């Protein structure tokens, strides 16, 4: 059953970064009244954030805000990755809906102490809510198993002392690992390797299979001048996310005969459909409004089938760790 809340449920948020700002704007669009904000204890930014975003109550201690759960109906945790897990462990004791920023923890093993099936916790993998991703899932579900390929040209560099800085893989690439898990209904890794053993910064690949038989390859082409992308090939059609916010469906090829200007025959894929972000995804950070609506849905007794769970967060981290295990 849903909880009894006012027409504008009260939201509390922990965090004052740009991501927190996007959450505030999206939550208001979804019908929340954003009444409370906290940051790290004795934060120097929380009062200014509250003033700039017209939030009436600024808290000096995020843990105190969480324990005063009678003051709010739902909570967003958008603080630093290192602080998220402890705050979440406290927040779940309230029994109230929580939206927590990905990846939740730095290591998947840190999640083992949580109830990963807790229905009141959503993980903020906002790309699941893209119109392009919904179309990709529909495309996959409409036919036989497909051939799926994903490029992850993450920025991976070496620190001054030569150590490989892999934090972006845990903090950002996990978005793509989660998308694959979401689209294909779970994946089993069948192989993973580097291009050159001992040269992890050169990148590598993973291959996976889904339960229904889709074959998936993942290129971790670090630092390549390319967009994150995902392609699905099946029965003479290609569904492409490039960048992930925009989907294009291709069917057939146009043959352009040689000319005096270009003396070679060209084969051009024919785009038959394009899916672009709807207006509310353009005005706000893509996926955030529908994600906030999913949080509000928990108050009304409805769990979004799209939103990520803590189990999904663990799976995404395990994918990242499989690749990072080759790199370390």
What positions do the PLM features span?
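C-terminal helix-rich "cap/oligomerization" subdomain common to oxidoreductases
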Residues: 1-8, 38, 52, 64, ...
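Rossmann-like dinucleotide-binding domain that binds NAD(P)(H)
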Residues: 158-227, 231
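Short active-site oxyanion
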Residues: 32-36, 72-75, 167-168
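NAD(P)-dinucleotide binding in Rossmann-like oxidoreductases
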Residues: 215-290
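A contiguous active-site-proximal alpha/beta segment in oxidoreductase catalytic domains
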Residues: 82, 105-160
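N-terminal Rossmann-like dinucleotide-binding module
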Residues: 1-53
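Internal, well-ordered alpha-helical segments in soluble enzyme and binding-protein domains
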Residues: 110, 129-136, 144, 172-180, ...
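Beta-loop-alpha module in the N-terminal Rossmann-like domain of NAD(P)-dependent dehydrogenases
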Residues: 23, 53, 57-114
């Amino acid at each position: 059953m849903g909880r009894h809340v006012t027409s504008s449920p009260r939201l509390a948020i922990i965090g004052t970064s740009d991501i927190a700002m996007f959450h505030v704007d999206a939550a208001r669009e979804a019908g929340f009244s954003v009444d409370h904000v906290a940051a790290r204890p004795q934060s120097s930014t929380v009062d200014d954030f509250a003033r700039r975003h017209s939030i009436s109550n600024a808290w000096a201690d995020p843990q105190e805000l969480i324990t005063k759960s009678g003051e709010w109906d739902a909570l967003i945790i958008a603080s630093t990755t290192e602080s998220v897990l402890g705050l979440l462990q406290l927040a779940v004791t309230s029994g109230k809906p929580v939206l927590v920023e990905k990846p939740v923890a730095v290591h998947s093993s840190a999640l083992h102490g949580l109830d990963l099936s807790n229905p009141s916790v959503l993980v903020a993998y906002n790309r699941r809510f893209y119109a392009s991703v919904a179309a990709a899932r529909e495309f996959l579900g409409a036919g036989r198993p497909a051939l799926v390929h994903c490029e992850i040209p993450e920025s991976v560099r070496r620190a001054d002392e030569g150590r490989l800085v892999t934090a972006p893989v845990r903090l950002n690439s996990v978005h793509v690992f989660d998308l694959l898990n979401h689209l294909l209904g779970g994946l089993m890794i069948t192989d993973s390797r580097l291009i050159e053993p001992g040269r992890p910064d050169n990148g590598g690949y993973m291959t996976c299979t889904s339960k229904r038989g889709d074959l998936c390859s993942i290129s971790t082409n670090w630092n390549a001048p390319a967009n994150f992308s995902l392609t699905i090939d099946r029965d003479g059609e290609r569904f492409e996310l490039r960048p992930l916010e925009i989907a294009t469906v291709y069917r057939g090829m146009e043959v352009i005969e040689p000319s005096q200007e270009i003396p070679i025959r060209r084969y051009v894929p024919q785009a038959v459909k394009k899916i672009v972000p709807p207006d509310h995804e353009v005005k706000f950070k893509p996926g955030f409004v529908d994600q906030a609506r999913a949080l509000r849905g928990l108050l009304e007794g409805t769990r979004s089938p799209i939103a990520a769970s803590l189990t999904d967060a663990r799976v995404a981290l395990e994918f990242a760790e499989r690749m990072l295990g080759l790199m370390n």
